[in-house]
């Protein structure tokens, strides 16, 4: 577990792909010996890569697998990628590189790919696909022959879950033989097919949602991949992201008989992946044998203000400029009415009486709020793989990369008084191209005017802008994909949010993750300490006293962006600090004395995603040790960590637990899903309202589902990691230790460090932050306060209420005409983005 930095992170940094366990040390004589099936898998992959290198492009067969997401019989998409247009661009590029393929028109391509999805939703659609040459047959005998080569335990598990393969609804009978039907669109030697659903529709919804812990994919899932391996020389998993790398099995160092590798076999996998999701891209590397080809996020622009907010901003400035009197009073009435109409008063967490009691204070808050909305990075539509954004959006992205110092300097250079420079981008969203910062970029970046006569700071910014603008060209994406299809090495790069980390571009490179041994970095530690104090202050302001217990949701994708700032918050709340070696690697933690801390410790429960568990076991070890140290500081009268640890230990001893086991359980603070499993189960369960009757039963079943899925403990003793319950208290009276530790949670914290992914972009914030809130309400009868550690901008990060954060997201996206029009221009793919 602790060797992830050495065996995985460092080789991935160098560009090594498909790292497999091929040998082991024999206990009897300490000799390194090959593990035959594993070593064979490495050899087979090397042979297939060599074949890609030697086969002319015109002779290569390539399969492209797309995702049926969001669920629905007409839906195909990927995260912030226009899939139909991207497929067409890739097909054009493959043709130009000598591949035997054609490129249908966009509407025809969408219609044909939608036909391929129909059998997953409706009976009687297999024969029409076969008649239209939109499917092929895989003899069931071929699948059985493959199945019989697997270990007996694997065969038994598959048959126990799904019965005999012949029972699959994707099987047809012809000429006395059974065949799996594989929907596919054949364009020359390129095959495009949907990734098969994990389920075959034979398991009851109640069992699948509430009781399944392993969720083995169906016979049909494996059959589709078997057919793909037989037909194709390489496989493209198209966009972020599919299901194969999330199948059950070990976190890393998988066996070839674990479901993720069982599906893939040894076929080379190219995986175009969004640059701002390094964590899940790493999952595709380690569990999907993939070479990642990074692609851009959508371009961005400062959101600006829509008409109602522009009017509000104008009223605000009128009020500030007016002398006391009737006109100013009338303006104040109009401004408050406008703010109420747009629900901005509520968004600021205020009431009308509070506004009236301190109108000048309200104006200051409103002014800051409108500036933040106008300057917020707003995604502009979707990205098309291999295509550069249009000039307006490209320059808008560069503007955001350069940030407030450039905006102010550009405005002052254009003659704006310094006291008004911060208004440079605060105006109607349609007029971005008329602003001074944008026009300066256009002249010196696009038109190439010299910068020699400009102030030195502007010269430096514009040189950076020229590089950033060039890097937004996206030329490397198609080049990178074609290189992988040639079996070639692909240069590496770090990814992340391009606004915060412009070095994530140019794209078309093989993404690697952050070295987990450096979490938190010393910079993240200093920022995290301040963020922790900000969190305490925010809670005091809202609730009148400091929190005693908080629960944090830890995400791999977030940690790879903020380098451990959220972990630093948790450590400082506990009153523990990291110890680094000379190279910046964390080697341990130590307790901060109470007098040095200057306040009581805060008890912290840590709920980790499955991906975090996989990628950061060494960080979990340090966090577990930190919780233990804080729980052992029993001489502090105001230490809730020690108090809660002792309370839980005593409860467990009273129920019959061994005192040492009880003490370990009391000191445990980290929980996640079972090893090899991912998610909370809430994403599917909330849509299955037909499995409960009434809100009370629904809340109870959802909370119990969440607690059962996320109860696996990662405490001070690594040997006991990943276990549910408490040793000695198994059976009917088994203890859910996670539930015991969640009781009394006063606040739950999630970080947001991406300018692209917000609270509503995916269901993950709902699953994890919402799951904590749901569980605590179930346990305590009262939901905790929900906080967002907003790490999008520079500095230590702000702590905001989730409601306020969500309100700003709605104002700059779902309720903003610029965002809506951007998606409308994407056609079919934009509609799916709204649906998602």
Please report, for each region that a protein language model flagged, where it lies by residue.
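Ligand/cofactor-recognition surfaces for anionic moieties
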Residues: 1-836
